[in-house]
């Protein structure tokens, strides 16, 4: 069985890139274009990992993270933040750890390596 990963990203080009990269690695990738849709998908089918943007319409990534931490079914789901919001990086690294925050543009090899470490690989 392949490992489910949820990509929550409002930029269609970044979302598509992440979906393509992760699918090519063998992950079962679901996507959401905003935080509200991402929370709904995570609640209905908890993933092994969420890749989360911070700046999104409707419900931003920080709020998504707070909601996940308040939900017993999602509290233990690991999150990797992928953001272009430079000023948010220190706080996110404090919360999630240095290795779980990537600034856009990100190094593909490093991000895929971290996803593999967190999930144990695609299968």
Summary of predicted features, one role per range:
Residues 9:
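Conserved acidic carboxylate
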Residues 15, 57, 75:
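The feature encodes the CheY-like receiver
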Residues 16-24:
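Charged docking surfaces used in two-component/phosphorelay signaling
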Residues 26-33, 41:
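Short hydrophobic/Thr-rich beta-strand motif most characteristic of the beta2 strand and flanking loop
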Residues 34-37, 53, 59-66:
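Acidic catalytic/metal-coordinating carboxylates
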Residues 45-51:
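Active-site beta3 strand of CheY-like receiver
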Residues 63, 85-103, 109-113:
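Alpha4 helix (beta4-alpha4-beta5 surface) of REC/receiver domains from two-component response regulators
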Residues 80-82:
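Hydrophobic/aromatic residues positioned on beta-strands within the core alpha/beta folds
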């Amino acid at each position: 069985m392949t490992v489910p990963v949820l990509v929550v990203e409002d930029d269609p080009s970044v979302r598509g890139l992440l979906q393509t990269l992760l699918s090519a690695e063998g992950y079962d990738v679901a996507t959401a274009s905003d935080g509200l849709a991402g929370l709904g998908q995570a609640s209905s089918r908890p993933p092994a990992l969420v890749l989360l943007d911070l700046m999104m319409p409707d419900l931003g990534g920080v709020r998504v993270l707070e909601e996940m931490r308040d939900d017993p079914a999602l509290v233990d789901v690991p999150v990797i933040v992928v953001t272009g919001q430079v000023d948010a990086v220190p706080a996110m690294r404090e919360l999630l750890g240095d290795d779980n925050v990537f600034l856009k543009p990100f190094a593909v090899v490093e991000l895929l390596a971290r996803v593999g470490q967190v999930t144990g690989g695609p299968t």
